[in-house]
């Protein structure tokens, strides 16, 4: 036998608020949802995404492990 009254109340028209404005309605177990970011203002979805790479990842790896682009490999040093 299934237990009665164990499921939360379902709100089919729950309002989603972002910056004080209703941005969409969805089904939820809460009547109102307040979010900071949604697809309408997220940089990835709006096309305003910027990749900020202050230091190249490869250069950082090489510096971290003591390899620089000016060093020669061991094979080149033994041939001289």
Swiss-Prot record:
Gene3D superfamilies for the chain: Ribosomal protein L31
> InterPro entries from the entry?
Ribosomal_bL28/bL31-like_sf, Ribosomal_bL31, Ribosomal_bL31_A, Ribosomal_bL31_sf
User: Which Gene Ontology terms describe the biological processes this protein takes part in?
Assistant: translation
User: Matching Pfam families, A to Z?
Assistant: Ribosomal_L31 (PF01197)
Q: What domain of life does the native source organism fall in?
A: Bacteria
Q: Name one GO cellular component term.
A: ribonucleoprotein complex
Q: Name one GO molecular function term.
A: rRNA binding
Leader sequence range is: none
**Annotated keywords:** Ribonucleoprotein, Ribosomal protein, RNA-binding, rRNA-binding
> Sorted alphabetically, which PANTHER family does this protein's record hold?
50S RIBOSOMAL PROTEIN L31, CHLOROPLASTIC, LARGE RIBOSOMAL SUBUNIT PROTEIN BL31C
Quaternary structure, per UniProt, is:
Part of the 50S ribosomal subunit.
Query: What functional role does this protein have?
Result: Binds the 23S rRNA.
- Give the family from UniProt: Belongs to the bacterial ribosomal protein bL31 family. Type A subfamily.
Q: What is this protein called?
A: Large ribosomal subunit protein bL31
């Amino acid at each position: 036998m299934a237990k009665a009254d164990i499921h939360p109340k379902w709100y089919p028209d729950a309002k989603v608020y972002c910056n004080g404005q209703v941005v969409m309605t969805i089904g939820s177990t809460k009547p109102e949802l307040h979010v900071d970011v949604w697809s309408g203002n997220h940089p990835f979805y709006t096309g305003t995404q910027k990749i900020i790479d202050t230091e190249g990842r490869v250069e950082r790896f090489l510096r971290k492990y003591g390899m620089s682009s000016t060093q020669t490999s061991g094979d080149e040093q033994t041939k001289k």
